[in-house]
């Protein structure tokens, strides 16, 4: 079996793939040998699953018929692309195009496979739980036992918050990763509680954002939410792409499965420093709000199958969703922009010569800011890697990385138009990290700088600079150095302004063995303070440490 086998592979094996014949027969065997239920009627009468057995048998009958038709057509169990076209011709779908008939048939398959996969999972978990003790510790109406969590003796109609709260609890713990079968059935039976009023409620909006900020298990949380129908109910646009095929040579997963893999890639990139992705690991842990990246990842392909440009459609729906969550207009617009532009970076890096200045100029006209560039780069990398593992390679990675680095350098060389909204948002994100006394010091400093300073410096950089200022608040000069990316050094200097200061600093850095490759030069509104940032690298094989460079600067 190939390394990316899944229920949502575009060419499934109708006997062995998850959610097909093997899964259903395994569940039947457990029910027969452990519960004495030796027929489908007996299983139905025993109410094994609270939401009814009819949907499960319908799913089984569909996949069984599909397998029979595939066997007749190809003498194999694998429903490959050629077989899909042939089988769909005989599936009473002649009133639509061949492409659409395949998509309709396969969407029905994926829905059926999901139903059988869930049935198999529930039966297996019921068997495991059969010998376990009752749930013990209670947390906010939620009970935990070993690695499972559940809701007991609670009417969800009066406690709707528990629907999301149970996923929040899983995200808090490394030990808890599963929901017990009774609670899964309870949530599925009450899925209609997630209605328009629920979706518009600020409490549940904040809960959803907290789920996205989970420290643990986020990928499995989102998949479980989808399995139980929670994600589709809360994001109706997501329901429309469940089982949606991508009928091309690039995608090997349905839209919903591809979406989960994008978020999983982001998650792994954040948690682990994978070989070759050191830069991306650093970037993803520095972006101000990880939930912005996750939401963009969830929505970037949700416009597919609706007719028209899926990026434009997704941009509108993601903007409305972010506003519904109560996110700021800056954050909502960034999410919408990411969805709208999510293809531009891969397109330019692979189709144009990025060594040409005009190519970089064209690209940064779309991006404009470093913060937007960081988010777009991370979304692009993880989107491509989740499309088809066999098509991702180091060459594509290097093209994207080169485009990112060249664009970042170019953006830093250009004057940035002042944006009061962006400046205000970044100030707020920085000040919230400090206490009242420190905040007052920083406010006085910020008030003496115009908006272009805050557009040029992203939230992470401003936070670092602010920490240096607070640490050295009684000194006339503030100097800080830190390693960034792979072999670069960022140097921040805040000092009393004077004539020729920039020239003096560049000469000092040059004598220290550092080559200046980028610089942000700012003076305060009253022209009394200089706040300069240099991006440098070691010249040749200079072994000077960053602390030595800082000492040299202080001696100027």
Located regions from the model:
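Non-catalytic interface/linker regions that flank or bridge core catalytic/transmembrane domains
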Residues: 1-251
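Amphipathic, well-packed alpha-helical segments that form the structural scaffold of globular domains
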Residues: 25, 121, 226, 236-239, ...
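Alpha-helical phosphate/pyrophosphate-handling elements in metalloenzyme active cores
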Residues: 30-42, 252-293, 320
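Divalent metal-dependent catalytic cores for phosphoryl transfer on phosphate-bearing substrates
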Residues: 44, 53-65, 254, 282-413
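Single conserved hydrophobic/aromatic residue that forms the stacking wall/gate
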Residues: 545-556
